[in-house]
Amino acid sequence: DYIAIGKFKKNKYKNILKGIYKGCKISSCYLSGGETAEMPGIYNKDKFDLAGFCVGLVDKEKILDGKKVKNNDLLLAVPSTGLHSNGFSLVRYILKIKNISNKNILKELLTPTKIYVKEILKLHAKNLIHGCCNITGGGIIENLPRILSANKAVEIDLDKIKTLKIFKFIKQNNISDAEMLKTFNCGIGFCLIINKKNLNKVKKVFPKKFKPYPIGKIIDFKSKKIILNGKIKF
């Protein structure tokens, strides 16, 4: 990890590290090292910049490269906890323009990102997934094509997506459906592609709050990688 901070404050630094350690523990990974830079000339005393990355290993034959994805495979949505650290530039703009200071909304915006590592590793070990992707910046529109081979596409029923209150709030501020889909996860933190016969086995791996559910299926590619039907019920 890397932390740049305006003025070193022990308690604040300690809380930041606690969060990093907690994330590593949930992900079953180690914090191998890091750097802390105190930069008063760059950052205000109460500001900090945090960055980090993870490196993993996988056997070549176990890489999910899209080759396992077949026609009529199910596309599953795994619920998110909120924004998952994406789309905050647009959200800050809305809060500023509308002069919003509702504590419930602000608290919901700070809901920690769900980390799916343990569930995904269990599914992968049992050979239950053909493809998967984290829904971050770009939403389902930009992230799903990355896990599809050149000859496959996905058909999505938007009306099956179970969105969250925070996205309903954002949508109410004159944000188009297209902008919502390309900026936010809209309630989907992770996507899985599986054989439909394995649906119940896959669902059992997740706790109740994060049970995956079908929102589409795999089809042959014709002209678009993502075919959208219906509308999200914001």
Language model segments and positions:
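Glycine-rich anion-binding loops of enzyme active sites
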Residues: 1-88, 217, 231
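Glycine-/charge-enriched secondary-structure boundary and capping motifs
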Residues: 12-32, 43-48, 98-110, 114-234
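Short, compositionally biased
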Residues: 88-99
